[in-house]
Amino acid sequence: WEDVQMGKDIADQMIAKGADLLFIYANKVGLGCIESAKENGAKVIGFSENQNQLDSDTVVASVEFDFGAIYKWTISQYLAGDLKGNKTYGIGIKEHIFKPVYSDAVPEEIKTKIANEMKV
């Protein structure tokens, strides 16, 4: 989670094998991934927060978590008696937990297509 160089090394290997778009969720390791992508002409989708501002030419979009929505969903499920132990819950787009954040590099037609696909 903390080894920036490891993230760069792994991304270098992936790009050398033909990857041109990387999606990584690994805290500081992701910074190494972004560095590698920038050096090698690849693109990155950030995760958990808006990482576009790190390098909007390289990080073309991010999947942003709405942690407030996560907490509200969890508390509402608990209060309703619907949150059970030993069970995995799949939450995300439907509950407005995840949302895409785009850089200017993403064309409007792609943003619209994704928005239409995300409607639930």
Give residue ranges: language-model regions.
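A residue-level marker of the well-folded mature domains of exported/periplasmic proteins
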Residues: 1-120
